[in-house]
């Protein structure tokens, strides 16, 4: 579905400009603060950005633990003394200082945290901690690689991997039967224009196939049943 801005631009730039054509343009997308909700129970309602902000503001916070109670004043003090220090560095230093405190020094803050937790339990009896989901999940580096003939070749090599079967005659002569398209010891050519990472992956895949064949051969050859 085209946006409102692109539809307006197409109408104004056309040679046959007609003001009546503006009436056929849908009103969706006029404001960037309007968000469409996919919830079927909302009956196709429009939700503004202010309402979404309000739902975030109404989120119940977790009760403070002993470390948070202690670090409130310490964080302000350290931020005033070191205005150029980042918040992450302040948190690291506060965590290190908290570990250096004795149990007797930490005990008053544990008591304060227990009181806050009791008050929080009375105010929100049905409260359940729900961690926030990360908006951007880290993706695997392999999925970021662009597809080229070399990567497809690696996939074909893995798909064509087959186990070698051996049949023994009475005179213990071994005959090998392979269903692989490429002969053993010869790997398919790799595209020279591919990236070094993909060439390494193809080489690693070929080595794995050779190791499988060697291991299977050794298992059948050393088996006492066929000796």
Curated annotation (Swiss-Prot):
Ranges annotated as DNA-binding: 60-128
Residue span of region Disordered: 23-56, 170-205
Keyword Transcription tagged: yes
Keyword annotations: Activator, Calmodulin-binding, Cytoplasm, Differentiation, DNA-binding, Nucleus, Sexual differentiation, Transcription, Transcription regulation
Intracellular or extracellular location(s): Nucleus speckle; Cytoplasm; Nucleus
Presence of the UniProt keyword Transcription regulation in the record: yes
Domain of life: Eukaryota
Ranges annotated as biased composition (Polar residues): 25-56, 170-180
Pfam family name, one: HMG_box
GO-annotated biological processes: cell differentiation; male sex determination; positive regulation of gene expression; positive regulation of male gonad development; sex differentiation
Family matches, as InterPro entries: HMG_box_dom, HMG_box_dom_sf, SRY, SRY-related_HMG-box_TF-like
Record-level GO cellular component terms: cytoplasm; nuclear speck; nucleus
GO molecular function: calmodulin binding; DNA-binding transcription activator activity, RNA polymerase II-specific; DNA-binding transcription factor binding; RNA polymerase II cis-regulatory region sequence-specific DNA binding
PANTHER family cross-referenced by the UniProt entry: SEX-DETERMINING REGION Y PROTEIN, SOX TRANSCRIPTION FACTOR
UniProt record similarity statement: Belongs to the SRY family.
Task performed by this protein: Transcriptional regulator that controls a genetic switch in male development. It is necessary and sufficient for initiating male sex determination by directing the development of supporting cell precursors (pre-Sertoli cells) as Sertoli rather than granulosa cells. Involved in different aspects of gene regulation including promoter activation or repression. Binds to the DNA consensus sequence 5'-[AT]AACAA[AT]-3'. SRY HMG box recognizes DNA by partial intercalation in the minor groove and promotes DNA bending. Also involved in pre-mRNA splicing.
Subunit structure: Interacts with CALM, EP300, HDAC3, KPNB1, ZNF208 isoform KRAB-O, PARP1, SLC9A3R2 and WT1. The interaction with EP300 modulates its DNA-binding activity. The interaction with KPNB1 is sensitive to dissociation by Ran in the GTP-bound form. Interaction with PARP1 impaired its DNA-binding activity.
Protein name: Sex-determining region Y protein
Organism: Callithrix jacchus
